[in-house]
Curated annotation (Swiss-Prot):
Function: Binds the 23S rRNA.
SS bond list: none
Record's protein name: Large ribosomal subunit protein bL31
Known partners and oligomeric status: Part of the 50S ribosomal subunit.
SUPFAM superfamilies: L28p-like
Organism this protein belongs to: Serratia proteamaculans (strain 568)
Biological processes per GO annotation: translation
A matching Pfam family: Ribosomal_L31
Free-text comment on the cofactor: Binds 1 zinc ion per subunit.
Length: 71
């Protein structure tokens, strides 16, 4: 590797909003503030919600349905 052309690879601290502190190595050079991490993200904690409130076909049928028509 050529000397003097690569960025410095330093150890930084990533602080999550839930209070979790993660030590990582990065070229950023300063500490990071995270919104979510693996400890508090809904997908990893199992607290995710289903957002299946109907698809495009359901919206189309609701919008263009004829009152009194048989299904």
């Amino acid at each position: 590797m050529k000397q003097g052309i690569h960025p410095k690879y330093e150890e930084v601290t990533a602080n999550c909003s839930c209070g979790n502190v993660i030590k990582i190595r990065s070229t950023v050079g300063h500490d990071l503030n995270l919104d979510v991490c693996g400890e508090c993200h809904p997908f990893y904690t199992g607290k995710q919600r289903d957002v299946a409130t109907g698809g495009r076909v359901d919206r189309f049928n609701k919008r263009f349905s004829v009152p009194g028509a048989k299904k």
